[in-house]
UniProtKB/Swiss-Prot annotation:
Gene Ontology biological process terms, A to Z: heme O biosynthetic process
Membership in a protein family: Belongs to the UbiA prenyltransferase family. Protoheme IX farnesyltransferase subfamily.
Protein name: Protoheme IX farnesyltransferase
UniProt GO MF annotations: protoheme IX farnesyltransferase activity
Domain of life: Bacteria
Entry function: Converts heme B (protoheme IX) to heme O by substitution of the vinyl group on carbon 2 of heme B porphyrin ring with a hydroxyethyl farnesyl side group.
Coiled-coil positions: none
GO CC annotation terms, alphabetical: plasma membrane
Length: 298
């Protein structure tokens, strides 16, 4: 095999890998892992570790399938936006049939793995999440309503529920609390992004909130949602899922998020919107990391 042929094959593999939106999937699997950990009291057994690994792989495959499907549907939109113009589908480097076939293979492989080696409930919940994101959100909600992020956020909030179901075989109230936290976190996270990327969204024709309702209204919504999110993030402590370690982390992180949102509402700048968006990622990651530490240390 020539060096040129090998180089082309590696390039194609990288293109298919990019379709799965690796950074997004890392956060999805991390959130699913939190659900798995909290569903198991104490340290997991070797069998439980194996089950968790299989569940993570299955969820990763189906989530990657949903991301690839999204790339096909939104290729013309992606091509108009600086943030997404690099995607292989937007650049025309991969044909639609190739991407759809790739998506179907990933979805089938992940679903089979979850059904036979984890449990049927997790498979059906994961497949429902695939439909929720790939079809309900991407095809129906996103191009039609500025509330796309709010309603469509349900599919993005599912990972801890999937993780819990994988280990416990059911969906407990603890999993629903984690779902609620991510569900309420999603709008201010994406609206902060949309604020400083508003021209991209305007060119794309997507009815994001800053485009349809303006900058000032969107900033107010970001602020209000961070207040509601603050209350939701206290629920693991109130319900008895965690102790003082998580409580302290939740209070500090949510105060930080609320402060960013307040300053953004009071005196807007693209730089501050970008910082708010980045902090939202830190917020969720550290919040769940604190929940994980609390579970094992206290």
């Amino acid at each position: 095999m020539s060096v040129h042929v090998l180089s082309v094959e590696v390039s194609v593999i990288k293109q298919f890998y990019a379709l799965t939106k690796p950074r997004v999937i890392q956060l999805i699997v991390f959130c699913a892992l939190i659900g798995m950990v909290l569903a198991v009291p104490g340290l997991p057994t070797w069998a439980e570790l194996q089950l968790a690994l299989l569940a993570c792989l299955g969820i990763w495959l189906v989530a990657g399938a949903a991301a690839a499907f999204n790339c096909v549907v939104e290729k013309s939109i992606d091509a108009k936006m600086k943030r997404t113009a690099w995607r292989p589908t937007a650049r025309g480097e991969l044909a639609d049939w190739q991407t759809l076939l790739f998506s179907a293979v990933l979805c089938a492989a992940g679903s089979i793995l979850l059904y036979f080696w984890v449990n049927p409930l997790t498979m059906w919940l994961t497949f429902a999440t695939f439909i929720g994101y790939a079809v309900v959100y991407t095809v129906i909600l996103k191009p039609l309503t500025p509330q796309n992020i709010v309603i469509g956020g349900a599919s993005g909030a599912m990972p801890p529920v999937l993780g819990w179901a994988a280990m416990a075989g059911d969906v407990g109230p603890e999993a629903l609390i984690l779902f609620l936290i991510i569900f309420l976190w999603t709008p201010p996270h994406f609206w902060a992004l949309a604020l400083y990327r508003v021209e991209d969204y305007r060119k794309s024709g997507l009815p994001m909130l800053p485009v349809t309702h303006g900058n000032e209204f969107t900033r107010l919504m970001v602020l209000l949602y961070t207040f509601i999110l603050f209350a939701a993030c206290l629920m693991p402590y109130v319900y008895g899922m965690s102790s003082w370690l998580y409580l302290i982390a939740a209070v500090v992180l949510n105060l930080g998020f609320c402060l960013y949102a307040f300053y953004l509402w009071r005196d807007y700048s693209d730089l501050l919107a970008r910082k708010t968006f980045r902090f939202s990622l830190i917020h969720l990651s550290l919040l769940f990391a604190a929940l994980l530490l609390d579970h094992y240390l206290l």
